[in-house]
């Protein structure tokens, strides 16, 4: 059993293979397409999700991951004896998800539920593979034996200097 856990939201767009290979926990966003609400990566595959978006006449709406859901996930980590929890999330300026994770960790520390578990929560300031890529790289580095402090420093440097350019296509 690893003494660390990596967690991200489903906006990171990593492959299911990397998710499984590195034991990364993906917390899904709820997405409303028309009158239907689905949980990304749970109720629908990435390919089917993209197809649904192109067929939907309305702009999809997403719902932030709640503080309550983060507390549930963090409590699971504590129960499993995880020492360090790295959480990498979608741009905090575009979603309240990051703030909810920070609040959940702070509440757990304040009331003692965190125990000795340390939470390292990153606002990626990016979208999609702008934080999915460093998430997988962090997993690779940890599996290769790099220290937690080294990987945390690398992630801080990445998110402090990352620039993301998007190209739209149809």
Report each predicted region and the residues it spans.
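N-terminal glycine-rich anion-binding loop in soluble enzyme alpha/beta folds
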Residues: 5-71
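Conserved active-site and cofactor/substrate-binding residues in soluble primary-metabolism enzymes
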Residues: 44, 48, 65-69, 80, ...
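Glycine-rich phosphate/diphosphate-binding loops that line cofactor/substrate pockets in enzymes
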Residues: 72-84
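Short glycine-rich or small-residue beta-strand-to-loop segments that form or flank ligand, phosphate
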Residues: 84-92, 120-123, 137
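Short Gly/Thr/Asp-enriched flexible loops that form oxyanion-binding sites at enzyme active sites
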Residues: 89-112, 133-135
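Short, acidic/small-residue loops that bind anionic groups at enzyme active sites
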Residues: 105-128, 147-148
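Acidic/polar active-site rim loop that often engages polyanionic ligands
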Residues: 114-118, 131-140
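Internal, active-site/partner-interface "lid" segment
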Residues: 139-170
